[in-house]
Each structure stands twice: as structure tokens, then as C-alpha cells.
């Protein structure tokens, strides 16, 4: 049975909503008057939550969350893997299996639009500093390979309208509204990106369908 069309006023589903980028997505959405459903593995403390947001506890690797997606117009995935020696060696399959389960739930509920966080470094970037290429990239290899596999998964999915946001090195600093958005390659001097600027861009990608 074909799903009923969903209006632009319908809520957005944000996964990984309790993380740094996820929280900034919620703040930007509320500021713009956009309704959101915030999905998070471990719910933030009440004092850390964004006002006027519906929070739902969800383990994307194990839970059935299709019913909670009903009526949403799009999905924003701010799922991410915290870096540590153990996750660098053997990262949990959050980008691959987690995204696959998001896509399955979207298919079951008639949602076709998703924006995810990947990384600029899944592709060679001529403008990045030498120290990053020599130290950080090797340490992040397994996580970056999983991000690349996630993008391949999205590319193969039928009927899916997807965008992978590929930020540079993320910083926990205030919003500037000056993010430089390009295709494939980082712009010169744009090695670093703020969580809040990434969040605003991801929200724009959904709202403008870009």
C-alpha cells in the first residue's frame, strides 16, 4: 500500500539527537519553527534537553522504531561514533548497520528523504594539513571506511533521496552562519567546521531538498 503524502509541516526525525551536532540541529529547527522528533540511545538529562522537542529513547541497532517514524517527512541522522582506542580498532556498526536499519524503517513508513553525517576525509583532500594525513587519518581509517560503506549503502537503496554531509574536523564552538558548502572537496582554508554550522547546513539540505 502506498503511503499518504506527508506535508512540509510534518515533523523531522533526528537520530543521534543528544550529541553535539544533533543538539544543534534541534536548536536550529526550533528556532525556525520546525517540529522535530528527537531519537537518542540514552536520553539527555532534562536540563540538557532543547525546549519544545519530543524526545524518544531508541537503540537504532536493536529496536523497532518504525511506528515512531510514522508521519515524519524526513530523517536527519546525526549518529556518530566517539573516538577512542577501542572504537578506532573496532568501531560499532553505527554508520552501516544503524543506517541500514534507518532506511528499512523509512521504507516501511513511506519516508524517502534522509541526510546523514559522513566526513570530508572519506575522499583524499589536498587542502588538509600534513599532520592530519600522517597521524589522524591512519587512526580514523576504520571509522572512515565505515562511513564510505554507509554512503555506498545509501547509493544502492531504491527510491531514496539522500545527502551525505561531509564536514571537516569538527569543533565545539559557537555558530557562525559562514559554512562554505562545496561538492566532494573541502574549500581551501575550510579544514575545520563547527558542529552548529554543520547542523544548520544539514537542516537546510532537508528543507531545501538539496
Where are the model-predicted features located?
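Conserved catalytic-site loops of classical short-chain dehydrogenases/reductases
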Residues: 73-74, 112-116, 163
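Conserved beta-loop-beta element that borders a ligand/cofactor-binding pocket
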Residues: 151-173
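Conserved Rossmann-fold NAD(P)-dependent oxidoreductase catalytic core, especially the SDR/UDP-sugar
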Residues: 11, 18, 35-37, 85-86, ...
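N-terminal Rossmann NAD(P)H-binding glycine-rich loop of SDR-like oxidoreductase domains
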Residues: 10-32
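Substrate-positioning beta->alpha
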Residues: 146, 165, 189-203
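NAD(P)H-binding glycine-rich loop region in Rossmannoid oxidoreductase-like domains
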Residues: 12, 38, 44-101, 105-108, ...
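Glycine/proline-rich active-site loop of Rossmann-fold NAD(P)-dependent oxidoreductases
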Residues: 174-179, 205-210
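Conserved SDR Rossmann-fold cofactor-binding beta-strand/turn motif
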Residues: 40, 118, 166-169
